[in-house]
Amino acid sequence: LKCNQLIPPFWKTCPKGKNLCYKMTMRAAPMVPVKRGCIDVCPKSSLLIKYMCCNTDKCN
């Protein structure tokens, strides 16, 4: 699995076990990603932070 890093077009191949790509954004500024990368379990979104997870190459 390949996931985008914070600044596309840079990306990395995920290590074994981390089979989701994720993008973290602030709810106040949903178009500006704060963090991107590989993750094993999708974190829960909160009142301030939203997580978007997916499992195909560079989908974040």
Swiss-Prot record:
Note: Positive charges of Lys residues are necessary for cytolytic activity of this toxin, but not for its binding ability.
Presence of the UniProt keyword Kinase in the record: no
Cited InterPro entries: Cytotoxin_Cobra, Snake_3FTx, Snake_toxin-like_sf, Snake_toxin_con_site, Toxin_cobra-type
Species per Swiss-Prot/TrEMBL record: Naja pallida (Red spitting cobra)
Keyword DNA-binding among UniProt keywords: no
Protein name per Swiss-Prot or TrEMBL: Cytotoxin 1
Tissue: Expressed by the venom gland.
Assembly and oligomerization: Monomer in solution; Homodimer and oligomer in the presence of negatively charged lipids forming a pore with a size ranging between 20 and 30 angstroms.
UniProt keywords, alphabetically: Cardiotoxin, Cytolysis, Disulfide bond, Hemolysis, Membrane, Secreted, Target cell membrane, Target membrane, Toxin
MF term (GO), any: toxin activity
GO CC list: extracellular region; membrane; other organism cell membrane
GO term, biological process aspect, one: killing of cells of another organism
Disulfide bond sites: C3-C21, C14-C38, C42-C53, C54-C59
Primary location: secreted
Family: Belongs to the three-finger toxin family. Short-chain subfamily. Type IA cytotoxin sub-subfamily.
Function statement: Basic protein that binds to cell membrane and depolarizes cardiomyocytes. This cytotoxin also possesses lytic activity on many other cells, including red blood cells. Interaction with sulfatides in the cell membrane induces pore formation and cell internalization and is responsible for cytotoxicity in cardiomyocytes. It targets the mitochondrial membrane and induces mitochondrial swelling and fragmentation. Inhibits protein kinases C. It binds to the integrin alpha-V/beta-3 with a moderate affinity.
Record's subcellular location: Secreted; Target cell membrane
